[in-house]
């Protein structure tokens, strides 16, 4: 995703998605992410050929074959057969849930660490896995709709709604304002609430409490998990909290990677959490897309940036500027905070496009045509 936000030529990222479709690795959740990756590729490129070519593969990646009558999935109840593994092109052994990495205790390989999953209890019906399942179904509904398959689009939408209903009735802890780790668990890891919040699964009347719980845990996840933690906070309009985590200087921070002497993002926050960490790892680069997509708020509203959505969430920043690439030309956004807390914005919208701007403080919405614009709140 960071590639799509920082470049206007997406060949490397597209090749990576195609490879992962045919050669998935072992975590359940990463296979479930495939429909989201394919959908985002379509939004950024405007090219639907990947969706058409891999449609049936993407359907299988939702793991609909693992659903029970409640719309919940599990890899640990006997439904994960060789045939199901073959349908998602998994040829190895040991397909299982991950939640976060590295894992600790009996579930993990890294015995030196307690793991980065905030004590998550690995239950048969796993909250995190089912949040991913819900998201995969939502993405498939959008993909089917984009391809004109309205019957499939409705079916996947209804399946997602059923999954959401079960999660919200069975796995919500009203007293703590958070989701439990799975069926039969009383533990609430940060992950069990940040993933449903990031994926839009949390009902409107629970968003504030869920966000407060997630925020109260700090950065209780790995750098991989940080992508979803910060997405969750931005989804809940907690932009100042997200900014503080992104700009943090503790052990779990991008600042710490620099302090260790690395010139490329690393696999883990620090060798304390993973002594054999990679010193060049793509998932460590989440901040690259979070700044563009969330802090500056620039995303494609229509495929190929035919229409651009700009919803800045600057937190307490005084000044920010970005030159965001797109296939139609660069999008420029400069924000300067005024003494009254409101912002002055300078924007450039490329030719053959238009933008929907939501102002950061007043939340007023404006439509911008190609060219330069100066906007005062």
In which residue ranges do the predicted regions lie?
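Well-ordered alpha-helical scaffold segments within catalytic/enzyme domains
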Residues: 1-7, 34-50, 132-150, 194-204, ...
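Hydrophobic alpha-helical scaffolding
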Residues: 3-7, 24, 28, 44, ...
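Active-site acid/base region of carbohydrate-active enzymes
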Residues: 4-15, 29-32, 44-129, 147-193, ...
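Flexible, solvent-exposed coil segments and beta strand-coil junctions
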Residues: 16-20, 176, 207-213
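Solenoid-like repeat scaffolds
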Residues: 21-25, 183-184, 212-220, 248-252
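Short beta-alpha connecting loops at secondary-structure transitions
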Residues: 85-88, 96-123, 177-182, 210-217, ...
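Non-catalytic C-terminal accessory modules of carbohydrate-active enzymes
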Residues: 158, 165, 240-377
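Generic helix N-cap/helix-start motif at coil->alpha-helix transitions
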Residues: 187-192, 220-226
């Amino acid at each position: 995703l960071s590639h799509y936000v920082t470049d206007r030529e997406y060949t490397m990222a597209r090749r990576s998605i195609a490879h992962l479709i045919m050669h998935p690795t072992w975590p359940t959740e990463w296979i479930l992410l495939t429909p989201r990756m394919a959908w985002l590729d379509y939004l950024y490129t405007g090219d639907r050929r990947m969706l058409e070519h891999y449609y049936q593969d993407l359907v299988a990646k939702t793991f609909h074959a693992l659903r029970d009558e409640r719309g919940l999935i599990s890899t640990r109840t006997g439904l994960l057969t060789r045939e199901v593994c073959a349908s998602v092109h998994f040829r190895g052994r040991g397909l299982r849930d991950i939640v976060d990495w590295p894992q600790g205790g009996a579930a993990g390989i890294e015995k030196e660490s307690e793991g980065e999953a905030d004590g998550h209890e690995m239950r048969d019906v796993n909250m995190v896995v089912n949040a991913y399942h819900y998201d995969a179904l939502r993405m498939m509904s959008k993909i089917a709709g984009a391809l004109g398959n309205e019957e499939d689009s409705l079916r996947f939408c209804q399946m997602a709604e059923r999954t959401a209903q079960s999660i919200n009735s069975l796995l919500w802890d009203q007293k703590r304002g958070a989701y439990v780790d799975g069926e039969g668990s009383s533990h609430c890891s940060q992950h069990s609430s940040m993933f449903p919040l990031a994926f839009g699964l949390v009902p409107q009347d629970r968003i504030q409490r869920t966000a407060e719980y997630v925020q109260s845990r700090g950065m209780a996840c790995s750098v991989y998990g940080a992508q979803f933690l910060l997405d969750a906070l931005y989804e809940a309009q907690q932009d100042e909290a997200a900014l503080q985590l992104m700009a943090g200087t503790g052990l779990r921070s991008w600042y710490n990677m620099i302090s260790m002497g690395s010139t490329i993002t690393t696999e883990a926050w620090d060798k304390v959490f993973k002594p054999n960490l990679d010193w060049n790892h793509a998932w460590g680069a989440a901040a690259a897309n979070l700044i563009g997509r969330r802090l500056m708020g620039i995303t494609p509203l229509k495929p190929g940036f035919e229409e651009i959505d700009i919803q800045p969430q600057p937190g307490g920043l005084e000044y920010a500027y970005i030159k965001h690439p797109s296939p139609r030309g660069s999008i420029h956004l400069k924000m300067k905070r005024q003494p009254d807390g409101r912002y002055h914005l300078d924007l450039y919208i490329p030719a053959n496009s238009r933008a929907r701007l939501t102002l950061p403080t007043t939340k007023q919405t404006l439509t911008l045509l190609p060219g330069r614009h100066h906007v005062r709140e």
